[in-house]
Each structure stands twice: as C-alpha cells, then as structure tokens.
Amino acid sequence: MTTVMNSTETGILGTCGIDADGLATDLDTMASFPYTDKYSDFVCGAWKSCAVWNGTGQGLDAGLDPYEGPAVVTDLGERLPYVRHLVGELFDLSLLKYGRLARLTPGSALVPHRDYLELDTNLIRIHLPLETDESCISSHNTTLYHMNVGEIWFLDATQAHSAVSNWTKDRTHLVLDFQADSLAACFTGEVQSPSIPSTHQVARQPVDREELAAFERAGILMDTTNYRDFLKIAIKTMFTRDITPDGVFDLLEGAARHSPAAARLDMIPPMRRYFLLARES
C-alpha cells in the first residue's frame, strides 16, 4: 500500500472567499440532481452523493473506483460553474482523483468508520462545506467539531470519523480526494497546518455507566428489523457522551446480547471489523 506521509490530522486549513450568489445558484442546481445511495450501509438515515469529478465523466459514478490519470468533470459537474471555478482557483486539478457532493439528510448519522481500507493507496481528503448549520457535527476519533461554509478542511479519513445532522435541511459538502505526496501539493497557494480550533469543538458529557447499561438492557426489544435503529441511537450517543467509536459497537453488541433474537443477529459482530479495521475491495 502506498501511504501519504504527511503526519497530519483532521483540521481546518484556511478559509476562502465565497460568492454567495454564485454558490446559491449552484445549490439550486444541485437540488435537482439525481443522487446515488452507493454507501447506504455507512449511514443510518440517508447519505446521498454524486460525482462532480471522477474517471468516467458520469455523475452517478460516485464510488472510489481506481483509474489512471487526472479526474474529468462529469455531466453533473458541467452544470456547476461556480463550484468548478472555486475548486480550480484553490487546488491543483492535475492531482484530483474524485470530487463528490455529499448530502447528509436531516436526522441522519454516519456509522463511525475509516476510509480507504479497501484501496491500494491512501488519498488526501478535503472538505468544502457548501450548506450547513451548527447542528451538523462531525467527529475525528473522540473529538467533535463543526465545519462552516467558507472553510477548507483536511479530513484524515484513515482515522475513525462520523457525522450527524440535526438540521432541517440537507448538509451539503464538496468532498475532494487527491493523489499526492503531500497535503501542500494539492493547493495552488499556501495553507496552514491543520488543527481543530477550540472555537469549532463541541463538548460532550461524561459517560454515565447506568445510561449505557440501560441502553444495553433495551436490547430485549432488538430484532432483525430494528437493529440499525439501535445503531443510530448508539452513534448519536457518541455525540453527547464521552464514548469512543469502538464504544458505539460495544453498545450495539451489548444490546444484541439481551435480544431474544440474538442468534439471528449474526450480522452485528462483523460490523466493527468492516467499519473500523478491514474491508475487502
């Protein structure tokens, strides 16, 4: 496996000026796009995506399928002049491999996971929030934070990360994946070292062991039709209580042990490995 050696962690890299009218026009256009739910197993709720740049030029090819050469603008990307202009000003497009719109729908929660496990190479991931709210929270390992429109964020996708949306609209981000030897190489200008400022961080309450035990006891109600509802509650608990990504799966597995249908919930124990440790390509 080729690994990008940059010893960086998730954090804000800087800000960029946003043309509010240009962005609003593109957001209106995005609202009419078709989207794929290719990664639906990674979300409780809905995480819709489409490609703005990829290797095929097809907007509904939103996966990370390997290919040679730089990315091309897709049929959907051709309809987003402001987004293309903004990305072209900020980044070296010759190193871009994938550019996707990611829309996290109201009330949804991403399963804590690590990316690139199924690939032969690690990529460098950048997030540009396009439409969001303070009630949309992301996580990097055990740190919670919020990203604002006009900010440029590096996401260390090799580390456990998640997100929840408590907003009434879709949280929309542009997610860019670069194949480069360093983070700095992806940009046309200078960028600061990534960090998560304290002003962006979100506090959690200490773990209450009785609350966690009560969640597990509620597993008596779990069956094959609702185990992902339990998963969603466990994920959202990570955004209010001081538990780890591993702790989310501890809660789910603990609840499953209380279920009368435990023997039929054999899909639960492999989930920790699939999301956090290893996936086949």
Stretch-by-stretch model annotation:
Residues 207-210, 217-281:
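Sequence termini and other peripheral, non-core segments
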Residues 175-233:
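Charged, amphipathic alpha-helical linkers/stalks
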Residues 111-113, 136-138, 155-156, 160-167:
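Short beta-strand His + acidic residue motifs that chelate non-heme Fe in jelly-roll/DSBH
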Residues 124-129, 152-154, 168-186:
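A short hydrophobic beta-strand segment most commonly corresponding to one strand
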Residues 111, 129-149:
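A short beta-strand-loop-beta hairpin characteristic of the jelly-roll/cupin
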Residues 101-119:
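Conserved short histidine dyad/triad with adjacent acidic residue
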Residues 94-96, 105, 121-125, 133:
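Short connector loops at helix/strand junctions that flank enzyme active sites
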Residues 1-91, 251-253, 257, 261-280:
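Non-heme Fe(II)/2-oxoglutarate
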